[in-house]
Amino acid sequence: MPSILLINGPNLNLLGTREPHLYGRTTLPQLEDNAKALAAAKGVKLESFHSNHEGRIIDRIHEARGHTDAIIINPGAFTHTSVAIRDALIGVSVPFIEVHITNVHAREEFRHHSYLSDKAAACIIGLGTYGYEAAIEYAAREIISAKEVY
């Protein structure tokens, strides 16, 4: 069965309570359950992973090599700081989609730069938690189905 790894970075465990005017009221467990259900409906297994620690995220990316068809990642604040996560994603050669709940380009200047975007198969920014659904749709349609053709 094709598979997607969903990674959520720092502070995303606070979804539903942290700045709900920006991030909404959906909690991380609700988001993960919804993502798994949508993926299953498309015949795709989705595994979710969250960490507030850069090294643990890197370790999980490394573990995905050879076992995962696509990665969906919301790196949180590591978007703007982590060359190490960038290098891990490049190193495992698994296509990835970068997701952000808010429009990072409409926020503080320091949030405008991403160390991941230029290497991502796609970037989904500012669609709220629907961005995760869009990422699953894209991964299933464009990344996984393309692999099955070849």
From Swiss-Prot:
Gene that specifies this protein:
qutE2
The species is: Aspergillus fumigatus (strain ATCC MYA-4609 / CBS 101355 / FGSC A1100 / Af293)
Residues at the active site: 23 (proton acceptor), 100 (proton donor)
Function as written in the Swiss-Prot or TrEMBL entry? Is involved in the catabolism of quinate. Allows the utilization of quinate as carbon source via the beta-ketoadipate pathway.
Alphabetized, the UniProt keywords read: Lyase, Quinate metabolism
Subunit record text = Homododecamer. Adopts a ring-like structure, composed of an arrangement of two hexameric rings stacked on top of one another.
Q: Which reaction does this chain catalyze?
A: 3-dehydroquinate = 3-dehydroshikimate + H2O
Q: List the disulfide bonds.
A: none
Quote any Pfam family the record assigns: DHquinase_II
Q: What class of enzyme is it?
A: lyase
InterPro entries, alphabetically?
A: DHquinase_II, DHquinase_II_CS, DHquinase_II_sf
* Source domain of life: Eukaryota
Question: Any idea what this protein is called?
Answer: Catabolic 3-dehydroquinase 2
Pathway, per record: Aromatic compound metabolism; 3,4-dihydroxybenzoate biosynthesis; 3,4-dihydroxybenzoate from 3-dehydroquinate: step 1/2
What is this enzyme's EC?
4.2.1.10
Any idea which positions bind substrate?
74, 80, 87, 101-102, 111
Q: Provide the GO biological process annotations.
A: 3,4-dihydroxybenzoate biosynthetic process; quinate catabolic process
